[in-house]
Amino acid sequence: MHSFQLLGLAAVGSVVSAAPTASRVSDLVKKSSSTCTFTSASEASETSSSCSNVVLSNIEVPAGETLDLSDAADGATITFEGTTSFGYEEWDGPLIRFGGKQLTITQSDGAVIDGDGSRWWDSEGTNGGKTKPKFMYVHDVEDSTIKGLQIKNTPVQAISVQATNVYLTDITIDNSDGDDNGGHNTDGFDISESTGVYISGATVKNQDDCIAINSGENILFTGGTCSGGHGLSIGSVGGRDDNTVKNVTISDSTVTDSANGVRIKTIYGDTGDVSEITYSNIQLSGITDYGIVIEQDYENGSPTGTPSTGVPITDVTVDGVTGSIEDDAVQVYILCGDGSCSDWTWSGVDITGGETSSDCENVPSGASC
């Protein structure tokens, strides 16, 4: 098991050598004591930076606009109240954007953030058809906590994280309505260019990856419940500005009625690095494609069957991945380039049902296929 380190929020701070002016002290006092309740997205976006407590009450975000809280005051608490809804327009989004330091983002009892994604769903996701807005950006956020959000029916990807030292706890993303209504590419959490991301107690019902880690380090996903999607994924890695995934632990989670259980995928012909990866105590049921799949052959979003070696996958621990898969599914599939997968440790892998694969290549010692 690899060490997992996050900077404690209590340790974050800076020392100011010069005493603030009287006017600066007055401004700080006003911000620390101000609670602002907004019922308008534009007002919240324009003036919330002056508030230490932001309440977003039954906001209806106009079509084609972002509920933009990227300039939130340091240390602010942001609370969703009632139902947050969004007008319909074909555009890229995001529908919500956060930014800032030492934020606490939460909701009141019974609140829901409802994307009403069925207006966009057409079974094509981001691959064509209607242009669908991304849902929530947690970008340029540092030393912050997001907890207890209830998110429903996102048009496509739900939460995009590009952040440093953030805690996302007890978040529910429920896109189960998309199962029969054309939901596609409705990823739960997409993580990239991040250091220190802790996701605990998430519930994700969707039609794509429960979590997808494309780049970043010191990432933990634990206590998750994932159903309907593509499983617990790293990648695809490659083809971006940052193509390193390091020190990731995914543990104590369940994956049900999904295409895959555990998945690592890298892009053919690209360069990067995937290392220090642990999957521990993952329970599977109703898996339709692969219980465990690790492959170095992705190109244009699909596997090719021909691996490359530019993104090595090293120091991988798979411990206690158990459960059942469907009759036509494959228990384990490993497709590595020559020498580009190494230092793997597997124990307690017990997947029943389905088939074994005869197409694995370059399986490193310590693993089995």
From Swiss-Prot:
PbH1 repeats lie at residues 141-162, 163-193, 194-215, 216-236, 245-266, 274-296, 308-353. Involved in maceration and soft-rotting of plant tissue. Hydrolyzes the 1,4-alpha glycosidic bonds of de-esterified pectate in the smooth region of the plant cell wall. Its main location: secreted. SUPFAM superfamilies: Pectin lyase-like (SSF51126). Disulfide bonds join 36-51, 210-226, 336-341, 360-369. This is Probable endopolygalacturonase II. It is an enzyme of class 3 (hydrolase). GO terms for biological process: cell wall organization; pectin catabolic process. Keywords: Cell wall biogenesis/degradation, Disulfide bond, Glycoprotein, Glycosidase, Hydrolase, Repeat, Secreted, Signal, Zymogen. It comes from the Eukaryota. Residues 1-18 form the signal peptide. The keyword Heme does not apply. Glycans are attached at residue 247. The keyword Glycoprotein applies. SMART domains: PbH1. Belongs to the glycosyl hydrolase 28 family. GO terms for molecular function: polygalacturonase activity. Its EC number is 3.2.1.15. It is found in: Secreted. It catalyses: (1,4-alpha-D-galacturonosyl)n+m + H2O = (1,4-alpha-D-galacturonosyl)n + (1,4-alpha-D-galacturonosyl)m. InterPro entries: Glyco_hydro_28 (IPR000743), Glycosyl_hydrlase_28 (IPR050434), PbH1 (IPR006626), Pectin_lyas_fold (IPR012334), Pectin_lyase_fold/virulence (IPR011050). It holds the Pfam family Glyco_hydro_28. One of its GO terms (cellular component) is extracellular region. Residues 19-31 form a propeptide. The active site is at residues 208, 230.
